[in-house]
Amino acid sequence: MQRQTDRHLGHYVVPAGRLNWLIPVLPIILSLGGSELQQTGSPVSVMLLSHNEVLPPDADGVILGEVTAKPLTLDDWFKYQKGQPLAVEITGRVEEGSNTSKPDSPAIGSRISRTLQLDPAIRNESICLVDGGWLPLIYCLGGTNIFVDRNIVAEIKARFVGGKLKSGGTAERDFLNMLEQKACGSTLNPLPYALEGNVQNLPDVDVVLDQLRIALADLAHALPHIRVWPKSLYDREQTQATLGSYHAYFNQGMDFLQRVGPSLMATTGKAKRRAAWARIIQAAKDTGISPQHICVAITLSALTASQQFNPAKNVLKPAAVYGAAQAYNAMWDLFLLFLLRQFQSQHSEYRSALLTRDKNLAFLWMGMTIQRTVTEAGEKQQVVFDERLMKCDPDEVEFLQALLGASNIGYERPRA
């Protein structure tokens, strides 16, 4: 059995976790209705094993550890929603204990890749946002630091008790039900729950500690077998340091959104687009906010994306009267993406993810990439948009680059 170690992350400690997969050699279609899966017309058996479990003597398969999955894209989401099977490429290390009768089986210690095909009948109401896109929760059950907010904790509390699905609950197949698996090696991190305020700003230290206490108790009651982080309350000094590191960024975003919120209501035609962009950048300068702040990029997307698909506008919810309450709600959603990206870029070894039920927030994440680059002037942030979130012609791209700096914003066309 592998000894569990503690890893330091900022002021806090995150426990390590690992999940082994027993998989057949060929591609499969994954089903949560039971242990049977469909593979070109013939059933196969797939199991999730914790790192100290052994392969059953009658099982024939390859055990994979250190499993990672290639993130899915916005295009993949649309295919999945249309009922099309979805292929996910996973890579893992062949572990001791693998048992297969096939003569060409991979060697112990080798790394192999396999493609698993998801059954579109499985619901994915809680979307796991990962570095580079999204994944169904099943691919984040081993060693992932999963941020959970108030809505997710409430859903877990309503669905589980004592590590089991509640009797009389929904019988539908949903990836969230996979949290019932005793082999789950990930960590649920309720930091977003603790930091969410209810007074149109980030909460004070006492509120953070109270909310963290509630979240930890609810998770322990619902899923006692799953690791949580932290295991106990932060001390006041640690909590104050965390709040202090986020307050300025959050407040700047709120001030900026209150200034520009009403101007985002109307559809901006192509002829008026450049003037609207220029006003947004001028508002950023007037409020003293960095053009690299996530709010600036998202407001530009809200002005530019089509009204048929505009997740930025749906998250910001512009209105004629856009006060502190509206700005807080929008900034909180964007702050979750900022928090996730900060952990991913500064502590990539913890494979941080955000579990959310907000599809518009998820679409934003799927349709943009927040990259950190190092230049002679220091570290900076670059936002790369999918074309559907910010469709521009070459001249408009040059105009934006003149406003923001050539390295601060870009876009990519959807894959064919």
Set out the residue ranges of the language-model regions:
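Residue-identity detector for glycine
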Residues: 10, 17, 33-34
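Low-complexity, intrinsically disordered or signal/transmembrane-proximal segments
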Residues: 2-4, 8-12
